[in-house]
Every structure is written in C-alpha cells, then in structure tokens.
Amino acid sequence: MGLEKKSALLEDLIEKCGGCAVVDGGFATQLEIHGAAINDPLWSAVSLIKDPELIKRVHMEYLEAGADVVVTSSYQATIPGFLSRGLSMEESESLLQKSVKLAVEARDRFWDKVSKTSGHSYNRALVAASIGSYGAYLADGSEYSGSYGEDVSLDKLKDFHRRRIQVLVEASPDLLAFETIPNKLEAQACVELLEEENVQIPAWICFTSVDGENAPSGESFQECLETLNKSNNICAVGINCAPPQFMDNLIRKFSKLTQKAIVVYPNSGEVWDGKAKKWLPSQCFGDAEFEMFATKWRDLGAKLIGGCCRTTPSTIKAISRDLKRR
C-alpha cells in the first residue's frame, strides 16, 4: 500500500469519528500503575525486554477506553540504547519491531472481539510507531530545552534516527509518530529522512513547548513548520507532552500556520524534571477537565486528541465519550 492510500486510512478514520479521532494516553505511567519498574534510561522500552505481555495489556486498556490510534512503546527504544545494555544489533532491531507487533496484535484481537458485537461505538484503530526525539535518548531533559549542543548537526540527527526508522517501517505500522521534537533542526532531519528512505507510511510530527508559544529551542512554530508543510510524508503536526492549558493557544496558532491535520496530546499538567527524574508539584487536570477540553480543542480545529504522561485509560475514556457524543 502506497503513501497516498496509507494517508487515506487516517483521513477516513477521522471522518468516521465525526471529524476528530482519539489518540491513546500515557504509556509509561500506565505501566508503572501496573507495577513495572521503568526508572531506566530505556524508560517504557525496558518492558519490551522484561514484560511484553504487560505492554499488550496496556494497549488493550486504551482500546477499550475508545482510542482510535494506539502508539507503540518505542518512544525511548533506540538501537544505541539497546546496544548500551549489551544487546546485539539483531536483538535491538527485533525489540523495535516487537513494539509494533505487540500493538498490532492487541488492535487485531480487540477488533476481532468487538466487531462481532452489534451496536458498538468503536473504530478499527490505527497503530502509530513512536519515534522519540534525540533528547529522549539522551535522557537529560534536552527534549524540553532543545539544546543539543553545537556538535549535533543535521547529519548527526539523521544518522541517529535512520536505522530506527528503517526497522520500524519494516514492521508495517499504519503511521509513524515523531514525538517531543524540541527544535527545527530535528524536525527537518525527520522530514529529510522520510524522503531519503522513500518511506511509504504517513507520519505526524509533534513538538513540545515549555512556554505555550514556541518550541523549547525558542524557535517560532512558523519556522519549525516551514519544512513540514512542504512534505507529502507528513500527514499531521502538533504538540505532545505539554500542559493542557497551552493547547488552546497552540491549536489556534497551528491552524494559522498549516493545512495539515492538527494533533494534540498533552500531559496531565504535571511537570517532569528531566534532570532530577521526578514529577514536580504543579496543577494537575482530571478526567472531567479533559472531557471539557476535548470539545474546545476539537472546535478550535484539532483532528486528533489524546493524552501523554500521567494521563490514563480513564482520561481517554472521558475524551472518547465526549468526542463521540454526536
């Protein structure tokens, strides 16, 4: 299936959902709720090694909550990260592919069950392969600063992402999801890689924001979106892992800057200290607030809405209930 037909899958899903589809929620934090120990440089990806069945269980929980798109557990799954744990190249690549296979297996099992039930309100979900930023691999909080240092060039970022993208594409997800991109340079690297590798799977690119106005690097989103807007490989652009209170302004901003579908999946409002590796006391929003937010974000122009860190299947159920209330 070529890029055009794959892109149509997302467009058709959004249409079936009444104009706005539901993305799943926080994955790593849901693993923690089930007792997984993920205080590790690999973060949620460590469960690909230790407990793949738990990963499938979390996917199922989000599907049952009403997610139309499930995102794989590969956000912090990188070949250099696996190699540093003593795994071979073959084992590292196999784990990356496993992240997609687990999500696909969960999606297919869930759909096989509910599609036989009359009157259900579910859609056959799409699987998006998560690709975390270079800063996520560094695990030093730089995905929230955009400061990679002068020695990190466009070519270095492409070299970092290339093999991971190749391996994930070989596993045949429906979408690629580049997440918490902090600067224009990495966004450009991702777009150029998709073209260089002739990737026939549509992708979204999500930035994050620490001020509600710009990318973490300080670059304007107008600058960041220039390359993305010209790419046929990019089906959607947006924001993830930023506070919910930033979304109204950012959706309005993106609506003026792009014709691409807009995707937003904020965190719960809590703030992660990437250096101290802990959540800081801050305003936290619950399911009732997210239910209200979802209506507003849809009305402002978002086409895909979900949750990131510290959101749960309960959050996604509230969002789904609201958006699918015709």
From Swiss-Prot:
Transmembrane stretches, start-end: none
Keywords: Metal-binding, Methyltransferase, Transferase, Zinc
UniProt xrefs under PROSITE patterns: HCY
A GO term for molecular function: S-methylmethionine-homocysteine S-methyltransferase activity
Domain Hcy-binding residue range list: 9-323
Superkingdom assignment: Eukaryota
Tissue: Expressed in roots, young leaves, florets and flowers. Not detected in old leaves.
Protein name, per record: Homocysteine S-methyltransferase 1
